[in-house]
Amino acid sequence: MTQSVHAETHGFQTEVKQLLSLMAHSLYSNKEVFLRELISNASDAADKLRFKALSDASLFENDGQLRVRLVVDKENRTLTISDNGIGMTRDQVIEHLGTIAKSGTAEFFKNLSGDQGRDSQLIGQFGVGFYSAFIVADKVTVVSRAAGTAPEQGVQWESEGEGSFTVADVTKAGRGTDVILHLRAEEDEFLDDWRLRSVVSKYSDHISVPVEMYKEGTPDSVGEGEEDGETIVGTPGEWEQVNRATALWTRNPKEIKDEEYQEFYKHVAHDFEDPLLWGHNRVEGAQEYTSLLYVPARAPFDLYNRDQKHGLKLYVQRVFIMDDAEQFMPAYLRFVKGVLDSNDLPLNVSREILQDNKVTVSLRKACSKRVLTMLAKLAKDDAEKYAKFWSEFGNVLKEGPAEDYANREEIAKLLRFASTAGEGEAQTVSLEDYVGRMKEGQQKIYYITADSYAAAKNSPHLEIFRKKGVEVLLMWERVDEWLMSHLTEFDGKQLVSVTRGELDLGDLEDEASKQAQEEAEKANAGLVERVKQSLGEAVKEVRVTHRLTDSPSCIVTDAHGMSTQMIKLMRAAGQPVPEQKYILELNPDHALVKKLGAIEDEALFGEWVTLLHEQAQLAEQGGLNDPASFVSRINRLLLQA
């Protein structure tokens, strides 16, 4: 390898500088993971070359035996991880090794606490890949040449993990990438042949590319004992495969240990943490495929970025085709990682071909169903573990009913909510739990959406339900309103918002209660008309209500109107929102409303009516358009009291 004069120095992206500093100074309890990450990258490079060579065999350059090699140089204290995969061009080296091209980076650094143990877990969760080399090395040299380019188009990248790196043109005879680690003084264990072999066996048995190390030969020797005087012929040195190099998903699930599944997940997902659960499934018949699907233990930083790449590793007849094949997993299951190996897709498949392919549609349905079945079993068998899943991925799963109509009922069974029957804001109540506790005569499932748990729990709309002992589901996440606009029924029972339309408790109310309501409406007809005239265009309608027991007033939307939370959701998304007028409901039994009816001075009456309307707006919407006028009005009325 010879170096040319075309050398440049580049500064690292700010986030990379921070990451490298963490790599150098974090006390990793498990330093050996750097080798897993680098071998995993080398394996991916081999997979990508194998796929590209399907349409251009010349990329193999008469060397189709793909492999990864570990080379130890004890004298110079270097460990080299070498592959003959796809390789990189100069521009690719600068892009991939000088920047972190993933969303969530800023949030990742914001979450770092300075606690080395906790930060090490976060680093693993973020997935640092190549940069893990700096855990054990104080200098890293990368020499690469892209397949299909001339030997003199090689490139060398080098950095000591500080603020910059150098890039130079070099001549490299073979394609692929060599990552040369100049080990720190205290990392001699990674120069030991047997130590490296044990790490490879532990982490890389499952990858399909052979990992090789050089086995020294033995010289000729003279025998002793019965063979005294005879010459024993030595053995030549040779490259020896040290991993099984068998794709894990092709093996019999009964023969695979949990530890092997866990290590394969870390390879596929580039995660340092064990998965929460997994499912290995082989199907034969009209379609033939194998899926190995994992649910991570922790949500990635970019989970809520729906445009971020997600999906499965796609193989066709054990040949790697692509990463992040999102066509096989709906967006609401974008947290799922794993492998799909199909015998029914063509080897020359592209993302465009996958888009409208019948096989793709069928596989997507099967994979979605498989994940939902795994989650249902987890919820049934291990409530504590499912609660952990829900805390990480629950809000994403709530997108499901809008996206996957066919599985809406199965998704609904997996949802969890807080409720007025529980203590605190823990979301532990399923819809099946709710239905099982419904009061005699109750025909509907009641819920409320609000800005926060406190706003939902203390809403005046819940007063009549508390009085009658009827459970109400409490929702305050931004996605909840979107969810409930698509989940309108469960187990044959309608889901009803307590803040929309006229209150109808059905058989929960007796005839005497209904009669009393009608009488209250008649008795307060004059007051209602005065309030309407006073508020004018500020409200859609005014009426008396029996939904309140402690509050004097509340506002509601009509049965088909847009809810407060949906309006906020659309505004946050920059969507145009039509003007919304609310219905003001008055509690005829409240002292303030009775006092209101006795006020003859129209100006004073108007002040009190406006105050009751603003109070109701504040309780429902969490804010007012003109809070200063509200405060002034309260002060004026207090002075008159």
From Swiss-Prot:
<comment type="subunit">
    <text>Homodimer.</text>
</comment>
<dbReference type="GO" id="GO:0016887">
    <property type="term" value="F:ATP hydrolysis activity"/>
</dbReference>
<keyword id="KW-0963">Cytoplasm</keyword>
<dbReference type="InterPro" id="IPR019805">
    <property type="entry name" value="Heat_shock_protein_90_CS"/>
</dbReference>
<dbReference type="Pfam" id="PF13589">
    <property type="entry name" value="HATPase_c_3"/>
</dbReference>
<dbReference type="GO" id="GO:0051082">
    <property type="term" value="F:unfolded protein binding"/>
</dbReference>
<dbReference type="GO" id="GO:0005737">
    <property type="term" value="C:cytoplasm"/>
</dbReference>
<protein>
    <recommendedName>
        <fullName>Chaperone protein HtpG</fullName>
    </recommendedName>
</protein>
<keyword id="KW-0346">Stress response</keyword>
<dbReference type="InterPro" id="IPR020568">
    <property type="entry name" value="Ribosomal_Su5_D2-typ_SF"/>
</dbReference>
<dbReference type="InterPro" id="IPR020575">
    <property type="entry name" value="Hsp90_N"/>
</dbReference>
<dbReference type="InterPro" id="IPR036890">
    <property type="entry name" value="HATPase_C_sf"/>
</dbReference>
<dbReference type="GO" id="GO:0140662">
    <property type="term" value="F:ATP-dependent protein folding chaperone"/>
</dbReference>
<keyword id="KW-0067">ATP-binding</keyword>
<feature type="region of interest" description="B">
    <location>
        <begin position="352"/>
        <end position="568"/>
    </location>
</feature>
<dbReference type="Pfam" id="PF00183">
    <property type="entry name" value="HSP90"/>
</dbReference>
<dbReference type="GO" id="GO:0005524">
    <property type="term" value="F:ATP binding"/>
</dbReference>
<dbReference type="InterPro" id="IPR001404">
    <property type="entry name" value="Hsp90_fam"/>
</dbReference>
<keyword id="KW-0547">Nucleotide-binding</keyword>
<feature type="region of interest" description="C">
    <location>
        <begin position="569"/>
        <end position="641"/>
    </location>
</feature>
<dbReference type="InterPro" id="IPR037196">
    <property type="entry name" value="HSP90_C"/>
</dbReference>
<comment type="function">
    <text>Molecular chaperone. Has ATPase activity.</text>
</comment>
<feature type="region of interest" description="A; substrate-binding">
    <location>
        <begin position="1"/>
        <end position="351"/>
    </location>
</feature>
<keyword id="KW-0143">Chaperone</keyword>
<comment type="similarity">
    <text>Belongs to the heat shock protein 90 family.</text>
</comment>
